[in-house]
Amino acid sequence: MECYKCGVSGCHLKITCSAEEKFCYKWRDKISNERWLGCAKTCTEENTWRVYNSCCTTNLCNP
């Protein structure tokens, strides 16, 4: 599977996940608006006053 990952030029870098990594995630700090994207072995969706995290299981589904 491939997911987007944050790198030097922003969050558009495409990476190939390892065999154990079954999820793409998108994590955002609602206060600072910082975000991180990448691959994960496990993923828990979260939407609180501070953090938003979404998980998905198809290629490049975390833009």
Curated annotation (Swiss-Prot):
Instruction: Please give the residue positions where the record annotates the modification Proline amide.
Output: 63
Is Secreted tagged as a keyword? yes
Compartment(s) of residence: Secreted
* Single annotated GO MF: toxin activity
Query: Which GO terms of the cellular component aspect does the record hold?
Result: extracellular region
Q: Which domain of life is it from?
A: Eukaryota
Please verify whether the record's keywords include Secreted. Answer: yes
* Gene3D superfamilies (alphabetical): CD59
Which residues form each disulfide bond in the chain? 3-24, 6-11, 17-39, 43-55, 56-61
Classification via InterPro entries: Snake_toxin-like_sf, Toxin/TOLIP
* Tissue note: Expressed by the venom gland.
Maturation and modification: Contains 5 disulfide bonds.
Q: What is its main location?
A: secreted
The protein's UniProt keywords, in alphabetical order, are: Amidation, Disulfide bond, Neurotoxin, Presynaptic neurotoxin, Secreted, Toxin
Family membership, please give it: Belongs to the three-finger toxin family. Ancestral subfamily. Orphan group XIX sub-subfamily.
According to its UniProt entry, the function of this protein is described as: Unknown. In vitro, this toxin activates sperm motility when tested on OF1 male mice.
**What is the name of the protein in this document?**
Actiflagelin
* Organism of derivation: Walterinnesia aegyptia (Desert black snake)
